[in-house]
Amino acid sequence: MQADFHEYKKISNFINLIKNNEDLEFIIGSGFSESLEKELPLNLSLNKGNSIYLHKQIKSKKFFLDLKKNKICIPHWTLKKDISSNYLVKDFKSFGGNMINNYIKKIKLNKTQYFQKIIKGEHISIQFYSKDLDIKILSICKQLFRKDHCNPFIIESIVSKKFKRTIINKLHKICLRISRFYNLNGINNLDLILEFKTKKLFVIELNARPGLSTNMIYSKHKTIFKKSFEKEKFKNPSFFFGTHIIYSDKKLTLNKKQYEYIKNIQFSNNFSELPRENEIIEKDEPICLVHCKSKKFKILRDKLKKISYKFIRNLELPDG
């Protein structure tokens, strides 16, 4: 499932409105980087992120070939049909857990799909800032998934987590190698699996743009795009940060009463990407994001659940 903005005309109109502003800095964010087919008609030297060309490179077979060339561990993948059920069916363009399915016998792959071996381990994502062939780790998060057998890796939450220095050093080395190979710029997200048995790190995918962790990053690194931003050594956080996605269990069009509730919470630090009045949200699409922090991991998880439950109840939605 690819991002559907329902508003390509509005996006085009907005770009036409701003494209003559030669001093305008911009970032191509989540969803847009996966959907756009060509570079924006803006001053590309002011792009604070990565190009559409690069996004297309890393969302293709070439990405895995590049990683192998750089001796970076990835799960075994193949286009052959004679495999066992301990493989997933993935799309090279997958992000956020979309376009990943469990193996089905006699399945026929399309041109952008492949089989990837299942690695039993902890799913983590690392956010890092790239500039001038150097990097700074911004945060390291644990990924939590929705309970959905057909789509087992749809991300529901990310929560920051503390890791041993040996793991942090390994993550830094992997990010630095990838960043230098692709000459990455700005905020990037790398998804990995820390294998339970061997403690080996396997790279799953690179998303070379801001994503679900944006709120978390800006709450800790407010000067990230300023010249004064320093690339000091990453330290485990004193607070745990978390972001939870509230999905709709049915097709939803916000009525006036529901939108009044949305307006009352729109300036809360606990919410972002809230919907507009009369906006149509399809079943299983995100409604909004919930954010909070705590000094204890368990309390953070409980707070995310409590805030999400209250939101769902006030919108009179089924629990989910």
Regions found by a protein language model. Give the residues of each.
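Short Pro/Gly-enriched beta-strand edge/turn motifs at strand-loop
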Residues: 20, 107-113, 171-177
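ATP-grasp fold ATP-binding core
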Residues: 67, 75-77, 84-102, 111-126, ...
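Conserved protein kinase catalytic/activation segment
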Residues: 199-202
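Peripheral (often C-terminal) accessory segments that flank ATP-dependent C-N-forming ligase machineries
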Residues: 228-320
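A short glycine-rich, hydrophobically flanked beta-strand micro-motif that places a catalytic Asp/Glu
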Residues: 184-197, 320
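ATP-dependent carboxylate/phosphate-activation module, predominantly the ATP-grasp catalytic core
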Residues: 117-182, 207-229, 235-236
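Conserved N-proximal alpha/beta basic substrate-recognition cap immediately N-terminal to
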Residues: 2-80, 95, 280, 286
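Generic beta-strand structural signal
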Residues: 82, 108, 130, 194-196, ...
